[in-house]
């Protein structure tokens, strides 16, 4: 089973790493109890069509889906008549991860969400995006610019909420708002995708990034805290280099 796909108002299509596509078993059933449709005050039947683009027959994914349980949809408390309210959530990556998309998921009072990574003393802003609950968007990182984050990295999202008359999505800003599936209640989640990597795959991806940008140990690349940690040469190769230099 998988939590994907998710449907939200005005949502664009999901995209995945070309080498980390989702596997859908034959004869699978699609079941969801949270389609994020706007209520209209009466019982209504709705039809939702979901389509896929498949890889060629024989395709096998190189990577598996990365875990990313980043958010809070349980104990949210949004004050009445106040903007720039902040929500925070954290998640420690259990595996080396390449993040391929960022998708802020808020509800009516949502105005903005930011994603940052924390690795030791290094804190880097990865993405910030505005939010409009009438037009929910996912953002795909360009090839070669996807964050490459080592196991143990702390992901941190910050949500900015606007529960004032200036936010036309809010029906009555005089009311406080809690958590829930309805558009007039609240969620605070990053629904983006990524792939998990083994030690070897992660090193390979960083080597490709170093080659792509011709990196040295003096450079800084946002979203790849270990890219500037250059792997040591084997002892024999180091000795040969020193011998050549001495000659």
Language-model segments: which ranges?
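Beta-strand-centric surfaces of beta-sandwich/beta-rich domains
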Residues: 1-246
């Amino acid at each position: 089973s998988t939590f994907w796909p998710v449907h939200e108002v005005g949502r664009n299509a999901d995209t995945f790493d070309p080498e980390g596509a989702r596997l859908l078993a034959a004869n699978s059933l699609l079941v969801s109890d949270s389609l994020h449709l706007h209520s209209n005050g009466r019982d209504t039947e709705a039809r939702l069509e979901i389509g896929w683009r498949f890889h060629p027959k024989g395709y096998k994914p190189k990577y598996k889906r990365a875990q990313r349980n980043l958010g809070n949809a349980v104990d949210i408390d949004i004050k009445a008549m106040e903007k720039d309210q902040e929500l925070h959530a954290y998640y420690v990556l259990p595996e080396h991860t390449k993040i391929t998309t960022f998708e802020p998921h808020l509800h009516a009072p949502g105005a903005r969400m930011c994603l940052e990574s924390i690795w030791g003393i290094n804190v880097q802003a990865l993405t910030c995006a505005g939010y409009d609950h009438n037009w929910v968007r996912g953002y795909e990182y360009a090839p070669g610019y996807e964050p490459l984050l080592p196991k143990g990295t702390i992901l941190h999202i910050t949500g900015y909420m606007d529960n004032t008359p200036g936010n036309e999505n809010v029906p009555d800003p005089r009311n406080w708002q809690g958590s829930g599936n309805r558009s007039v209640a609240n969620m605070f989640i990053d629904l983006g995708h990524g792939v998990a990597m083994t030690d070897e795959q992660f090193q390979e991806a960083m080597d490709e990034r170093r080659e792509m940008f011709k990196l040295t140990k003096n450079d800084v690349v946002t979203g790849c805290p270990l890219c500037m940690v250059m792997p040591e040469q084997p002892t024999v190769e180091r000795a040969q280099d020193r011998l050549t230099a001495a000659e």
